[in-house]
Regions:
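Short, acidic loop-to-helix structural element flanking the phosphoryl-transfer center
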Residues: 60-61, 78-114, 124, 152
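Short helix-capping segments at alpha-helix termini
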Residues: 28-32, 73-80, 107, 131-135, ...
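Residues at secondary-structure transition points
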Residues: 30, 34, 54-58, 80, ...
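A metal-dependent, Asp-based hydrolase signature
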Residues: 33, 47-83
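Asp-based, Mg2+/Mn2+-dependent phosphohydrolase catalytic module
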Residues: 1-3, 103, 115, 119-225
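Active-site neighborhood of HAD-like aspartate-dependent phosphohydrolases
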Residues: 1-44
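An amphipathic alpha-helix signature
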Residues: 21-22, 36, 40, 60-68, ...
Length: 225
């Protein structure tokens, strides 16, 4: 069955989650990389734990809480950076090949969208900053159903809105756990494995693995292979 839509995860896939700390690396000091990793890991952990417990807080609130935890774990990083880091995260830099990849897919007549844990305001800020809006048909946020990926209800936002079958969607994510959830739902998934990480969740394998977004338009799954 031919692919009709390419749907992208946002954070880590289109937008660089470490760009905020990278911008202030000199000020953050020796613990900058560890600080950024903790911030990201705690952001995800809080989302998963809330969903598992049947509760919800929007992703921006969790991003703030996770940042505070990173400061607590890395006391050498100056807390005075907090406002600047949050401002940067609100308008995260896109990866260099993100815009061209979306443009190439749109040129093939495919629908394109974002499906993200991010809150609507976060996503709007990032999309506007990266100037991706013209190449997106939709931006879906979990905020509408108040539950986080990898729950199946999140992926159903796409099929319901576009009135298409799961197997007509190519879902693109750099997060292997997200690829697992989307594969379980029925999407045909592409894992963007920039860091050449070893695979996991073998029973929920992606149909393709790429190192960069600009490889997407040439994939044979576009023609339904």
């Amino acid at each position: 069955m031919p692919i009709r839509a390419f749907v992208f995860d946002a954070y880590g896939t289109l937008f660089d989650v470490h760009a905020a700390v990278a911008r202030y690396r000199a000020t953050a000091g020796a613990e900058a990389d560890r600080f950024s990793e903790i911030w990201r890991l705690k952001q995800l952990e809080y989302a998963w734990m809330l969903s598992a417990a049947g509760h919800y807080q929007d992703f921006w609130t969790l991003t703030e809480h996770a940042l505070d935890r990173a400061f607590a774990r890395c006391p050498s990083v100056d807390r005075a950076l907090r406002p600047a880091l949050l401002d940067c995260y609100f308008k995260l830099d896109a990866f260099a090949d993100a815009r061209a990849a979306l443009t190439a897919l749109k040129a093939k007549g495919l629908k394109t969208a974002i499906l993200s844990n991010g809150s609507p305001k976060m996503l709007a800020g990032a999309v506007e900053n990266a100037k991706l809006g013209a190449d997106l048909d939709a931006v879906f946020s979990v905020d509408t159903i108040r539950i986080y990926k990898p729950r199946a209800e999140v992926y159903a936002l796409v099929t319901d809105a576009f009135a298409i079958k799961a197997e007509e969607v190519a879902f693109v994510s750099s997060n292997r756990w997200d690829v697992m959830g989307a594969t379980a739902f029925g999407f045909r998934c592409v894992w963007v494995n920039r860091a050449n990480m070893p695979d996991e969740y073998p029973e929920f394998a992606p149909v393709k693995v790429v190192r960069e977004l600009n490889a997407l338009a040439a994939l044979d799954l576009i023609g339904g292979a």
